[in-house]
Amino acid sequence: MTASQDAPVPPAMGPKIAIIGAGPAGCMLARLLQRANVSVTVFESEASLDFRSQGGTLDLHTSTGLLAMKEAGLWDEFLEHARYDGQYIAWVEQHARQHFVMGASGARSDVQERPEIDRAQLRRILAASLPEGMIKWDHRLRRVEAPNTLVFDTLMTSDFDLVVGAEGAWSKVRKFMKPDVDPTYTGIGLYELSIPNASATAPELYTLVNRGSVFGHADGKRLSIQQMGDGSLNIYTSSLKDEADWMRPEKCGHDTSDLAAAKEALMEEYRDWDSTITDAILKASGACKTRSLYMLPVGFRWEHHRGVTVIGDAAHLMGPFAGEGVNVALEDAMRLAASIIAAAKNTENGKETLDQQVEAFEKEMFPRMEKVQRLTDELMHDYFHTPGVPQSIMARVLTRHVKFSTPAILHPLATLGVHSYMFLNSLASRWR
């Protein structure tokens, strides 16, 4: 049964849940709770679903993001937009020489799959699955006051048994729980560009990307090109920047919202790169966006607060370098939903059981998210702080990914397997 065919449910039971943020994590949590007949309200600061651009493409993984979509009863809707041929990934150096390629399967696998979907489309699927009125748009949370009072621009309420912060990097819910910790600047800033209708406007790049992604690397720099569902290419240029406000005209020397000026600056910054890759800058059109990347400390955690918790980026903000952010966020939603639903079934001591369940969820989440944070932090240092990338790091990067996905007892074998593969791949490349 698809989202649009879900049968009507009786009046909601148990605790009343407030979710702050209608991103993928917040909407997934709301969807799972709504299906279990738990009372839930989502508050979103944006005025509408399409209020702003929602970023690039995401790959969902078998045991986390994809499992959550199945648990939410949204598998058919997901398959309508999933790009299994988008699993192609190539790592190249600045002269466009390939150092590692993962080919697209073009088909589903029951063992391991990482299909792509646009972030905006994923959010649209999740939001559309919720009953009309469940998301309260244009509700910007200003602060949380003790015990668990939500203060919005035009509303103040204490009408919830649990408040879940899923509102991203600058979470007000997290600030209430842990006021002395803010995200820190990673030292990396990026431009986001786009090439619409790439098959016609940039056919060489369209062929290069092969409906997937190409990641170009040189010392302290990265240029990524990713296929989007609408046929456009998303371009990200990432490099080391001294200060988080590097995009101010007085610091970077140009207006970063001016595409022509940004192109000129980027072509100068990437002047030593092959034109096969930098054509992605020249062919871009439309809006030019900039931002700085932030992260929470690896191993970040908090003392349990009754009636409030956080998930997703609000709990474990990290860079995009491991490709795990949205997957672990959807896993958070799936696990927290199970905890809340279990508490809702206890009609005699529901609030106490809810608190115990949420605290147990947090204790499970802390080591799980630390593992992902550590992988992301290590990969960020590999990519941006190691000479001779990508050639100098490919074996290390692949080993990190394999170790992340395998039990510790298999790590020596995994390391040997990766290095053997890289050696054979190197020999084969000499004969091409």
Describe each region flagged by the PLM.
Residues L49-S53, A244-M247:
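A short acidic, helix-capping loop that chelates divalent metal ions and anchors anionic groups
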